[in-house]
Amino acid sequence: MTTITTAAIIGAGLAGCECALRLARAGVRVTLFEMKPAAFSPAHSNPDLGELVCSNSLRSDDIASGVGLLKQEMRELGSIVMEAADATRVPAGKALAVDRDLFARHITAVIEAEPGITLERREVASLDDPALASADVVVVAAGPLASAGLSDSLAAMVGGQLYFYDAIAPIIAAESIDLSIAFSGSRYGEPGEEGDYLNCPMNRDEYDAFYEALLAAEKVPSRDFEKELHFEGCMPIEALAERGPRTLVFGPFKPVGFTDPRTGTRPYAIIQLRAENRNKTAFNIVGCQTKLKYAEQERVFRMIPGLAGAEFVRHGSVHRNTYVNAPRVLADDLSLRADKRVFLAGQITGVEGYVESAACGMWLGMVLAARIQGRELPTPPPQTALGALLMHLRTPVKNFQPSNANFGLMPELGLKVKKRERKPLYSARAREHFVRWLAEAGVTPVIEPLLPTAPDAADATGAIDTTGATGAAREETAPTEA
């Protein structure tokens, strides 16, 4: 039996809160360090815990998607982040979006009410901080925006660090949207049917003018000591546009499934606006994360039909993201190879996304809690969403890159299927493996596990090769809207 009576967790974001709650409920005395409100990163502004920065969407809630499947696994394992998300969700079609203020408030209330957690609101600028010395385990869950001091301390321990940029989409006031042009509706919805998004249609001339202005707009320059690398799922809109004039039309601006009520025809492009809160007083411009200068953002995005008078509640911005080369520096239990007392959790490990970060922190908490009970918790199989994500952190590659949950991380199906059948079969197989893992690992689900419901799932899963290597072809990692 491993002796873990005290733990110090640096960072009270999604991963840190998940891990802290697991350990506290296992009887560990947890000190949870959070530098807000004494200090804020360039992208944070809310003093509450679990603040969502890049978007208020946790992406698809459909279990026939990688992230939707991961959400279901987390719900069954008792995730506090999923509890908060389900309690504060706002309409967003097939996606799970939340009122981000209520979401953070929910998580903060749960953490503050947990008797086993002591919340210390101060910055930990070094892994040599005296407050960490007496802890049996130290968990670094500082997120993608770890402070300079902590980043330097971690870099010294792992031999270096990498940077890339996450870009934030602008948010505009609802009352400034011209509803004689923008219309409510979801992709493939019936004409006139109210949907979860507002949609701004563009004809060819309007799109071409917007595209040229976007390419010519002045951007915030990168610092000369930072290497710029973009993760596909949060790429700045201007960087995506540089790939070619039609990239946006086949990407975030794709018009498929929409009819412009003014013309009765499909527009050349569609820009979607997603509600930021339950009252729908503000909307973010979906897929338009950007590093344009503020004045340029106003000039360019007001070219979108319906947004000529847009009032910017928050401009888009860019922030640094820090992560380690997990296969090289982390052991399978997420401890540092250089110091087995120090563990990493969340986005700093190389998982990408809100849900994935929370899942990572949740899993680490489960692993350490099991050790207190004298057992090693087996990792879920790679056919599951959680197992595939953890396998990504363990698989050595020449150029390790962050990844979100997607079916491309899983072993191949091992049989030929039509494209439309592929995702339901991956999901059905994952459900079968996850339920079996729960029983074999002795993990009691918090809610009744959802069993496979795909047509012919029982026959298909029996024919699937479960020993295959990780598929080389990955599904697109960018969030699917509407």
UniProtKB/Swiss-Prot annotation:
Source species of the chain: Nitratidesulfovibrio vulgaris (strain DP4)
EC number, as in UniProt: 2.1.1.74
Binding site for FAD: G11, A12, G13, L14, A15, G16
GO MF annotation, one: flavin adenine dinucleotide binding
A cellular-component GO term for this protein: cytosol
Cofactor list: FAD
Family: Belongs to the MnmG family. TrmFO subfamily.
Protein name, as recorded: Methylenetetrahydrofolate--tRNA-(uracil-5-)-methyltransferase TrmFO
PANTHER family: GLUCOSE INHIBITED DIVISION PROTEIN A, METHYLENETETRAHYDROFOLATE--TRNA-(URACIL-5-)-METHYLTRANSFERASE TRMFO
Keywords in alphabetical order: Cytoplasm, FAD, Flavoprotein, Methyltransferase, NAD, NADP, Transferase, tRNA processing
Subcellular location: Cytoplasm
UniProt-listed NCBIfam families: gid_trmFO (TIGR00137), PRK05335.1 (NF003739)
GO biological process: tRNA methylation; tRNA wobble uridine modification
Main location: cytoplasm
Functional note: Catalyzes the folate-dependent formation of 5-methyl-uridine at position 54 (M-5-U54) in all tRNAs.
One of the Pfam families matching this protein, by short name: GIDA
